[in-house]
Amino acid sequence: MLVDLRMRSAALGALFCTMALAAPAAAIELPTAQARAELLDTLEREALYRDRVDWPEMRARLSAAQGNPEKIRDVLKEAIGRSSGGHGAWLSVERMRSEATRSGRATAPAAITASDATAAAQSPALDPRIGQVEIGGFSVVPGPAVVQQMQERAARWQAIIRDQDTGKRCGWIVDLRGNTGGNMWPMLLGMAPLLRITKEGEETVGSFATAKDPSPWRSTPSGMRLGTRVIVDLGTPGYRLKHPGVPVAVLTGPRTASAGEATVLALRGRPQTRSFGEPTAGVSTANVVRPLVDGSALVLTTSVMRDRNGRGDGLKITPDQHTRSDAATVAAAQAWLLAQPACAGR
């Protein structure tokens, strides 16, 4: 899941799932000596948890490991892991190339624009008054079509909601249990019909918290902004529910990670919203990509995600109601929705 290096926006870069530093045992890939020095300098200067590392000691260990690829790899992996809380990574040139190829196949335009009628089908266990949308992980392919990919994916999720919104839905389930991360912006825009509670204007639904002022995530009727910067926009107002502001149940689990956790936080604090399931993966922090001198890249963890009320610590997000099995989670979410005034009177 490679984004435009130099992160034409720390915004477009969004959030990455954890990636392993280690290459297959047959061929250990490493940054060049110059890139290794640059990598450590960048971590010491910018990494979110940089104070957790003794940098002189780390450099001494790296120097002592010269000539031993396995030890070099292990030192770099430890430096990145400790300073990022386990969320950062080093990406070799080959890794980036293969990720781009894989993502390109997974997000081909035909797949993005295809009908999602089958994906939007109601679960047999759900009351017909309850709508449901699954927001899964999604990564963009770097290049000039990044914005188009985000627009198309967001429009697809909004269409899933629109196709179910017959006017008879009194509550909705947003299923994030399988959302392993990627790019958060199309996720937030895709579920905007459920996320937003007003028709006009901007709504702050979360933020990135750094040592400086927080950078708010802002939902508009047609797009998403980071502060005042437009990240993705449909060009025209997106879909609006027939009954805006209805109750929403959010499903989470241990696979809900990174951008998936950003999506959880964007919904947390929304009126008439409650979460169910198990705690998330615990990487509710934001990454940007820094290119290194040898063409490889550092996925650098720089900030903590927070909800619309300024709450967030970069760790696991605990649901409001802990349920263990998938069936129990869906049942608890449905029971809560049907007990709300919007459903109880129908």
Residue ranges with predicted function:
Residues 29-47, 136-139, 167, 176-346:
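C-terminal "post-core" interaction segments
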Residues 26-173, 177-178, 345-346:
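Terminal targeting/pro-maturation regions of precursor/exported proteins
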Residues 1-7:
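N-terminal secretory signal peptides that target proteins for export/translocation
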Residues 9, 130-131, 273, 298:
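A broad, low-specificity signal marking well-ordered, structured residues that form hydrophobic/aromatic
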Residues 11-20:
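Bacterial N-terminal signal peptides
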